Amino acid sequence: YYNRYADKTQVFSFYKNDDISHRALHVQLVSRIARNIGRMLGLDLDLIEAVALGHDIGHTPFGHAGEKFLNESYHANTGRYFNHNVHSVRVLDKIFNLNISLQTLDGILCHNGEFECKECRPSKLDNFKDFDAKVEECYIDQSAIDRLVPSTLEGCVVRISDMIAYIGKDRQDAIKTKLIDSESVFAESEIGKYNAAIINNLI
């Protein structure tokens, strides 16, 4: 199922450039960052790796533009909402029925962090019934995505690592595609200029 990441670009589509980030590279980078953090904190590295490698398995082609298009079409025809994290859970749990643990599925569902979050403290989740209710809420309430918080420290680490992984790579891709003319715009960045420095500084 990992092959579902093949040929899906991270942000920039329709560019013939081997250096542009793809989903497969992104999830590996998230996994590496999260495992490094998890190792320092004494967390479950197997759970971290499972969440990290599976978190974007339901993402659309053409990045978030593809997700936005599918969401608009899906909502217009069904009244429900499409979100890639919810679809990742659907792919693993419903379509392929892979018997994945509650903690792994929850980490995948709750990995989105594209909004301000100064603290990531695990939420309470005891059973699949409550998890399924949380998934269903995401289908019918567009704001439910913004309230998702992982139920484990491992899930929280992956969520933070996801942001660390794409901040620098998205900058690099923007420069390689000439969307940004020069690296000088990042020269004074507090988190670092290059991806490696950004990762090291944020970890």
What is each stretch, according to the model?
Residues 54-62, 165:
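Short active-site segment of divalent metal-dependent hydrolases/proteases
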Residues 35-47, 76:
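Short pre-active-site segment immediately N-terminal to the catalytic Zn-binding motif
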Residues 63-76:
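A glycine- and small-aliphatic-rich helix-loop capping segment at beta-alpha/alpha-beta transitions
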Residues 1-24, 29-37, 66, 81-87, ...:
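Histidine-centered, transition-metal-coordinating active-site segments
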Residues 50-51:
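Active-site alpha-helix of zinc metalloproteases
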Residues 16, 60, 73-74, 180:
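A generic membrane alpha-helix/interface feature
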